[in-house]
Amino acid sequence: MDRTSSRCKVAIIGSGNIGTDLMIKVLRHGRHLEMGAMVGIDPASDGLARAKRLGVATTAQGVEGLLALPEFKDIGIAFDATSAGAHARHNELLQAHGVKVIDLTPAAIGPYVVPAINLDAELDAPNINMVTCGGQATIPMVAAVSRVAQVHYAEIVASIASKSAGPGTRANIDEFTETTSKAIEVIGGARKGKAIIVLNPAEPPLIMRDSVFVLSEVVDRDAIAASVKEMVASVQRYVPGYRLKQEVQFELIEKPANVPGVGLVSGLKTSIFLEVEGAAHYLPAYAGNLDIMTSAALSCAERLAERGKVRTLPSALV
C-alpha cells in the first residue's frame, strides 16, 4: 500500500458498527491517515476490544477520556460516530483543542458534504457533516438530475438490513429523515426534499437498496441518464459496491400535482434504483449503509490531510 511520508493521526468516537468499520478502513487503507485512538463508553464493546488487539489506544470514558490520553496531543481529525444528541458537546470540546471534526451523525452542525458533489468546497470548515447513509447513497442522484434540469421535488427511500443498524443508528431515526430531507435541497438542488428510511428485518439480511424519485422540468432524457451514470462512476471511486440496479426510468407528468411546500407542478419524473454492497470490513456485504458512510468519511479525511488542512506528523514520529 502506498503510504505518504507524513500522516494525520485520527480519533474515532463511537465504538459501534460505524466506528469499528471506519477504524478497520483507516488501518487497512489509510494513505494520509494513522489511527490515534478509539473512543467508546462501553468497556465491553467489540469495537474497543478489536482496537486494543490491533494496538490502537483506547478509552471507555468518552470524549473526556480521549482528552486525557497522551495520544490526544497528536490528533488532527476526530470522527464522531455516536449520536446527534451527543455531537454538539463533543464538537465543542474538540474545537477548543483545534481538532478538525468529521461528523457521522445527523447533527449537521457543520456543512453537509457528499464527496462526489462538494468535498473540495468545504475543506476549510472546522466541522464537516456526512449527512446520513441514505443521503450519501441518494443525494448524488438528485444532484445528477439537478445539474441538467430544475428539480421541483425529490423523494428518497433507503432500505437497510435491520441487522446493520446498531443502537446509534436507531436512536437517530428522526434526525435521519430531517437531515437527509434538508440535504436533498441544500446540496442535491431540489426545491423540496423528502427522505424515508426502512429497517428491513428480512432473514437472511438484504443488501442496502435505495429508490430515488425526482420531479423536474422536462429536459432531454438522455442528458439525465448520462448525468446519472457519470455520477455513479464518481461515487464508485470511493464506494466500489455502489451501482444502478436497473436503467433509469422516466415518466411524463402532464397533469399538475400538488407538492407540499412547492405547489402545483408538472414535468418529468425520473426514477433511479440503486444498491450498495459493502466491502465487508466489519459487518458482511449486506451492510452497504455502513460502507458508504465510512468510505465517504474516509475520503473526506484523506483529502483534508492531503491538502494540509490538519496537523500531520512526519513519518519518523508515527
UniProtKB/Swiss-Prot annotation:
NAD(+) binds at residues 15-18, 164-172, 289. One of its GO terms (biological process) is catabolic process. It catalyses: acetaldehyde + NAD(+) + CoA = acetyl-CoA + NADH + H(+). Gene3D superfamilies: Dihydrodipicolinate Reductase, domain 2, NAD(P)-binding Rossmann-like Domain. InterPro entries: Acetaldehyde_dehydrogenase, Acetylaldehyde_DH_C, NAD(P)-bd_dom_sf, Semialdehyde_DH_NAD-bd. The active site is at residue 133. One of its GO terms (molecular function) is NAD binding. Pfam families: AcetDehyd-dimer, Semialdhyde_dh. Its EC number is 1.2.1.10. It comes from the Bacteria. CDD domains: ALDH_C (cd23933). Keywords: Aromatic hydrocarbons catabolism, NAD, Oxidoreductase. The keyword Transmembrane helix does not apply. Belongs to the acetaldehyde dehydrogenase family. This is Acetaldehyde dehydrogenase 1. The gene is xylQ.
